[in-house]
Design a protein with these regions (language model features):
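Extracytoplasmic gate region of multi-pass secondary transporters
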Residues: 5-6, 204-259, 318, 322, ...
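Helix-breaking motifs and short loop linkers at transmembrane-helix boundaries and internal kinks
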Residues: 17, 49, 70-76, 87, ...
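Central cavity-lining transmembrane alpha-helices of secondary-active solute carriers
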Residues: 28-42, 248-261
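Conserved MFS/SLC helix-loop-helix module at the cytosolic interface between two early adjacent transmembrane helices
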Residues: 36-75
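Structural signature of the two symmetry-related core transmembrane helices
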Residues: 52-66, 275-291
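Cytoplasmic helix-loop-helix junction between adjacent transmembrane helices
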Residues: 80-120
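Helix-loop-helix hairpin linking two adjacent transmembrane segments in secondary transporters
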Residues: 115-170
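Juxtamembrane intracellular "pre-TM" segments in multi-pass secondary transporters
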Residues: 169-211
């Protein structure tokens, strides 16, 4: 649904008669609600069957995606985005926790990279499908609604598939590595309280600088896709379908970069763990460089080439996040740790970054807004992550 909001943003804006600031603010608002919901979902994940919690949340998300297609004003759109944020909030703390418990330590970077491929695959296929649905529906002012109705159907199928997954043993591979076997259930400790977990996580310096760096990056990360879509509509007069396939193409290089980064990350982690985190920081900074260069070109081919390179760097960078957090955070606090990533991305950076970018966009245009917001967010975020890599071995 986030891809649909990105591609169909100009159509939604025209249909509901809202400004760039309002559109980006509502998108960011969904991120804020998502963030706030990650913390209770992390609490639930530590106490109940994680696949069950995730399947229920996915069902809520599917229902609110369909509701988004029926909204008639900005207030209703805010409710829809908030609801999808709640539903999607479960994925941030629960999915990485399940992956870390399901697969051995030595191959986690590759597994997280394989999981991360879902995003660029969705970014490649989703915009094309969203734009195509609107085109087939008639390309009218309200035909964007059809896309949201149809996108809720596969989400409902996913609910059943998730519920049927087997729940992995928590920390099994860490127990095996340290103790030579799994702990008996009677010996297991109770779940760590959220307040205690957050206090302990603040002392894991590599994790602290990682999430702060991601939070700074969030000022650009959340607002860029929708702003680029608005740029394509405003400056180039592209309709939903053309915007869709251009945004699809912009994620094609990430399909190559992500598996390569996952394999390279495993290799670097075995050599020296801090090198893998340093790689993430470098790729975050390069994302900012490529996107900024790209939006300064008026030639659409050059713009999309550099934007595509930026997306490839962004996708590759996040392959190192899951393995890093899994390595430095005790397995009983993984869900809480991953929930904090969402807090920093959307609450610290995403919400305010969306409002800031929208305000600059309304005042000076999308191209100038991106030029102002992206460079400091990506460069400072990348440097913070690289600085945090020095604490990897200690942590």
């Amino acid at each position: 649904d986030r891809v649909a909001i990105t591609v169909l943003g100009p159509d939604i804006q025209e249909s509901l008669n809202i400004s760039d600031t309002m559109l980006l603010g509502l998108g960011s608002f969904g991120g804020v609600v998502l963030v706030l919901s990650t913390i209770p979902f992390a609490w639930l994940a530590d106490r109940y069957r994680r696949v069950g919690v995730l399947s229920i949340a996915t069902g809520v998300w599917a229902g609110l995606v369909a509701f988004t297609g029926a909204v008639q004003n900005a207030f209703q759109l805010a409710i829809g985005r908030a609801g999808t944020g709640i539903g999607a909030g479960a994925k941030i703390p629960i999915s990485p926790s399940l992956i870390a418990d399901q697969y051995p330590i030595a191959i986690r970077a590759r597994i997280f990279a394989a999981e991360a491929l879902g995003r660029p695959i969705g970014q490649v296929i989703g915009p094309f499908i969203a734009g195509g649905i609107v085109l087939i529906a008639g390309d009218g002012p309200d035909d964007w609604r059809v896309a949201f109705y149809l996108f809720s159907i596969p989400a409902l199928i996913l609910v059943v598939a998730i519920f049927l997954l087997k729940e992995p043993v928590r920390g099994a591979y860490e127990q095996d590595a340290v103790l030579g076997g799994k702990l008996e259930k009677a010996q297991e400790e109770p779940p760590v309280r959220l307040s205690s977990a957050f206090q302990r996580l603040k002392n894991v310096r590599s994790f602290y600088y990682l999430v702060v760096g991601i939070g700074v990056l969030g000022f650009a990360l959340v607002a860029v896709p929708t702003t680029v879509s608005l740029l394509l509509e405003e400056y180039y007069d592209y309709g939903a379908f053309k915007r869709g396939w251009l945004i699809s193409i912009s994620w094609a290089a990430a399909l190559i970069a992500i598996p390569f980064a996952g394999k390279l990350g495993d290799k670097l982690f075995r050599q020296d763990p801090k090198k893998a985190l340093w790689l993430m920081g470098l790729l975050v900074a390069l994302y900012g460089v490529f996107v900024t260069i790209g939006v300064r070109f008026t030639n659409i081919v050059l713009l999309m080439v550099f934007y595509t390179l930026g997306n490839a760097c962004q996708g590759a960078a996040f392959t190192q996040m899951g393995p890093t957090i899994s390595a430095v955070v005790p397995y009983r606090m993984r869900a809480q740790a991953f929930s904090l990533v969402g807090v920093y991305i959307f609450l610290m950076g995403g919400f305010f970054g969306g409002l800031l970018t929208g305000a600059f966009s309304d005042a000076y245009g999308e191209r100038t807004a991106l030029t102002i917001v992206v460079p400091p967010a990506a460069l400072i975020g990348g440097v913070l992550i690289m600085y945090g890599s020095r604490f990897m071995k200690r942590d």
